[in-house]
């Protein structure tokens, strides 16, 4: 079959392209911007990429077009597909019909930690000899790709609540039919497609409804939003994580780089790994619980996490210059910002200076729906720098004024980088947070800090 994918350079759609290629299909695709690393990965798989959406790319006509959720009516390719009656479907629908139908699916859903937790679950199964398939919204550090078919019935998927396509506004995860389901947490997000928390809870409950009776749902007992969702009805086995639940994680070090796994009052494993932060400890515990459902002993799963490498942009060290370390993180919601800063504080200690640099870039952030929570979420930083995005209905100056620590802002990335470099002293830690490229600020900071060091040496 010849398959053409519209919007192929997103992590999810690129992952589907790799799976389709592995199944023996001829695969081509297009995107508005064909860019690395996805373009490089796809090129290696022998997948032809086309820049832009000129309708001529559909000649000769493919057997099937998979349409990404960024595509809208009016797109030349979308219009040609409809006009010529070319068979089409969404990415999640294709994944269900051609890959997941006969698999034991382990799905990881939730507002935060999906990529990390899915990566952990995949690595546990891999390290324990299960050779799982997977589709993850980032390239897990232990693998070179974001998706593969695998060689066993088990398939791990990052289950996103975003919608499927312009013709299917349900959350992607309703197509995945998991047997093992992790619900990490639930908060209001994606304000561009959800009106309120109840609308998200409704979609999450659709997911709960399709887990079989012999399936298992693993969720944190202290999450009130999930508790409300589960109260709408559950027909599957449940395992709760938390103080009053079946599973607990007990921290042995302040940065959570070492912790114990407890199940039903008994210690069943020890984790000593390269990650830090209680949020990662929580993610790891969820992954261990999910792996147990498919047959991995908790002690083996805990041991496997010792060699887990996270996906990029998860408290990733980008470099050091003039004695200042620069970290990058994908955090783009107050809860994630709070957790990431707490993790870094645990890592560097209570007296080291942390400088937080934030770009409010997600749709929810831009709409200002969580701006009142931003200043409190930045509380563990010693100094804050904020980028003012253009064309948003609120001012980051409001957040700067609400911060208890010194806080500054600029509408220009270069200016903001210069401000940070001027402030930063040897021994400081800079944490850059955004779900985008932030105008290449990481390298600008490292270059500026190196130049500052040279100037000091010159004197």
Language-model-detected regions and their locations in the chain:
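Conserved RecA-like helicase motor-core motifs
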Residues: 28-30, 129-136, 241, 408
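Conserved motor-coupling elements within RecA-like helicase/translocase cores
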Residues: 149-151
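Short beta-strand segments
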Residues: 68, 107-109, 135-136, 156-158, ...
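ATP-dependent carboxylate-amine ligase
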Residues: 1-34, 38, 43-49, 61, ...
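Switch II (G3) loop of P-loop NTPases
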Residues: 154-164, 326-332
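Switch II of P-loop NTPase G domains
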Residues: 163-177, 335-343
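Acidic, Mg2+-coordinating active-site environments of NTP-dependent enzymes
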Residues: 39-44, 57-67, 71-90, 96, ...
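Walker A (P-loop) phosphate-binding motif
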Residues: 4-5, 19, 91-140
């Amino acid at each position: 079959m010849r398959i053409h994918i519209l919007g192929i350079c997103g992590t999810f759609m690129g992952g589907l392209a790799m799976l389709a290629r592995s199944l023996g299909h001829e695969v081509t695709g297009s995107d508005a911007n064909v860019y690395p690393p996805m373009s490089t990965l796809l090129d290696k798989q022998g997948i032809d990429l086309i820049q832009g959406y000129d309708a001529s790319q559909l000649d000769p006509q493919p057997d099937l077009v998979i349409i990404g959720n960024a595509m809208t009516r009016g797109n030349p390719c979308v219009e040609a597909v409809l006009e010529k009656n070319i068979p089409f479907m969404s990415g999640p629908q294709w994944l269900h019909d051609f890959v997941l139908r006969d698999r034991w699916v382990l799905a990881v859903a939730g507002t935060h930690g999906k990529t990390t937790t899915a990566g952990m679950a995949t690595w546990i199964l891999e390290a324990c000899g299960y050779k799982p398939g997977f589709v993850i919204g980032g390239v897990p550090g232990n693998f070179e790709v974001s998706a593969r078919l695998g060689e066993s019935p088990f398939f791990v998927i990052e289950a996103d609540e975003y919608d499927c396509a312009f013709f299917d506004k349900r959350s992607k995860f309703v197509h995945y039919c998991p047997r093992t389901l992790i619900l990490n947490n639930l908060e209001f997000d994606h304000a561009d497609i959800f009106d309120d928390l109840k609308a998200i809870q409704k979609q999450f409950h659709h997911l709960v409804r399709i887990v079989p009776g012999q399936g298992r749902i693993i969720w944190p007992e202290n999450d009130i939003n999930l508790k409300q969702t589960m109260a709408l009805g559950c027909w599957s086995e449940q395992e709760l994580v938390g103080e009053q639940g079946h599973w607990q994680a007990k921290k042995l070090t302040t940065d959570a780089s070492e912790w114990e796994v407890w199940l039903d009052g008994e210690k069943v494993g020890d984790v000593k790994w390269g990650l830090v932060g209680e949020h990662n400890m929580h993610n790891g515990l969820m992954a261990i619980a999910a792996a147990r459902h498919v047959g991995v002993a908790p002690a083996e799963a805990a041991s496997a996490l010792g060699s887990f490498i996270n996906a990029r942009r998860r408290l990733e060290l980008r470099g050091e210059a003039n004695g200042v370390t620069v970290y990058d993180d994908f955090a783009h919601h107050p809860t994630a910002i709070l957790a990431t800063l707490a993790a870094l504080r645990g890592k560097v200690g209570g007296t080291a200076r942390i400088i937080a640099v934030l770009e409010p870039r997600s749709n929810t952030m831009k709409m200002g729906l969580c701006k009142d929570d931003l200043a409190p979420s930045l509380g563990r930083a010693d100094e804050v720098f904020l980028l003012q995005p253009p064309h948003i209905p609120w001012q980051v100056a409001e957040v700067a004024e609400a911060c208890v620590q010194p806080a500054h802002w600029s509408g220009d990335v270069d200016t903001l980088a210069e401000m940070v470099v001027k402030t930063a002293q040897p021994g400081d830690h800079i944490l850059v947070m955004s779900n985008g490229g932030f105008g290449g600020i990481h390298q600008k900071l490292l270059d500026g800090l190196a130049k500052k060091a040279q100037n000091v040496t010159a004197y």
